[in-house]
């Protein structure tokens, strides 16, 4: 039994030893026979939640007794707590509103390219639903509703940066790739918090459906604080699968202070593009709460983009899209736009830029995209570990 208990994460083992909870939401990693483990859990009184096929993982709510019983199975390699992820932006009241739109004569618009997004959902904002349908698919992992909604607001805001058409601002607050599509997965609740297992499931779903919707970019506008090796290796495995499927994953550097080596979680992986935040009000400087590198020998963030007082789409966070299976329609918004600050804004901007690059050349790889972005950046007058290769020059990027 002692050797078997080594399969338990140390925090989970301690909680079980001290009888802290009646049940434990856990992630179970299997070496093989995932379906057999799923069947075993469903046979009992415990609560099976989901299976993440690409990562050979199962999420479930189990009693301590069930955990100690199931861990004896040789096909199980590890059981750990299901941790949390957190969104990387906050609403701000500001008279200064920064638009991230590109020039009126810009050649590309993201046409034919879909951006997968894991966030708090997407409100059916007119800037996303008129002219062309911006939300190509909506999936609600939190509550299982069929129709788009957003009870936090971040997902709608990020969607607007990527592909809002600016129809209610005469184009002033148009997104970067207004002809692209959004596959929106709601994994975050109204407080901006998500179980990591739900995030894994969302990423796995986007990869599996990427061919059907031509998903070329996955935007993950959130962070995790854990350095748990299993969780990070699972993110890395999913990111590698995305790369092999022709998809680029874009993430924010995070919300820690911009002190040396403050980046945490998957933002430090070399299988994603990590975007730091800039304060562009007055002299451009690193945003105070933009997590910084370096990460060992790896340069992170990869590049930086504006993230302070960004203006994008507002949402009615009280709107619920259905009742008893029937679709409900939202009331007209009093204000179509709002301002937010945070590195998720910077990640959304770069996600939109990646959509434009894929419209230009759909065969580009992860390494191609990263090289093109880095070669088109300009270093700013502060430490490289805060900015990566610097601020992106979009004119230079698309000049060739």
Tell what function each PLM region has.
Residues 143-156, 338-348:
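Gly/Ser-rich catalytic serine loop of serine hydrolases
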Residues 215-219, 359-400:
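C-terminal subdomain of the subtilisin-like protease fold in secreted/lumenal serine endopeptidases
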């Amino acid at each position: 039994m002692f050797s078997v208990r080594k399969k338990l994460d140390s925090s989970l083992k301690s909680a079980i030893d001290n009888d802290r909870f009646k049940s434990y939401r856990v992630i179970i990693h299997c070496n093989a026979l995932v379906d057999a483990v799923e069947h075993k859990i469903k046979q009992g009184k415990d609560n099976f939640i989901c299976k993440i096929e690409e990562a050979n993982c199962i999420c479930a709510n189990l009693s301590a007794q069930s955990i100690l019983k199931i861990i004896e199975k040789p096909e199980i390699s590890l059981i750990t707590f299901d941790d949390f992820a957190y969104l990387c932006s906050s609403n701000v009241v500001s008279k200064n509103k920064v638009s991230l739109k590109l020039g009126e004569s810009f050649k590309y618009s993201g046409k034919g390219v879909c951006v997968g997004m894991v966030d708090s959902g997407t409100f059916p904002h007119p800037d996303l639903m008129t002219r062309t349908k911006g939300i190509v698919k909506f999936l609600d992992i939190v509550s299982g509703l069929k129709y788009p909604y957003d009870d936090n607001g971040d997902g709608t805001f990020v969607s607007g940066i990527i592909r809002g058409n600016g129809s209610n601002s005469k184009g002033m607050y148009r997104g970067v790739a207004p002809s692209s599509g959004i596959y929106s997965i709601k994994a975050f609740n109204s407080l901006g918090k998500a179980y990591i297992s739900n995030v894994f499931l969302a990423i796995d779903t986007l990869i599996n459906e990427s061919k059907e919707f031509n998903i070329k970019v996955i935007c993950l506008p959130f962070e995790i604080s854990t350095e748990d090796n299993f969780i990070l290796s699972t993110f890395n495995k999913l990111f590698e699968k995305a790369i092999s499927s022709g998809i680029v994953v874009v993430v924010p550097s995070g919300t820690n202070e911009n002190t040396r080596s403050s980046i945490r979680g998957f933002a430090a992986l070399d299988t994603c593009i990590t975007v730091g935040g800039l304060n562009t009000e007055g002299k451009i400087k690193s945003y105070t709460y933009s997590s910084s590198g370096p990460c060992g020998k790896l340069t992170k963030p990869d590049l930086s983009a504006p993230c302070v007082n960004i203006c994008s789409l507002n949402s009615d966070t009280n709107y619920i899209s259905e009742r008893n299976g029937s679709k409900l329609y939202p009331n007209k918004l009093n204000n179509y736009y709002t301002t937010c600050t945070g590195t998720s804004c910077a990640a959304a901007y770069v996600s939109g830029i990646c959509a434009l690059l894929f419209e230009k050349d759909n065969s580009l790889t992860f390494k191609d995209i990263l090289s093109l972005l880095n070669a088109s950046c300009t270093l700013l007058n502060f430490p490289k570990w805060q900015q990566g290769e610097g601020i992106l020059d979009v004119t230079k990027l698309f000049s060739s």
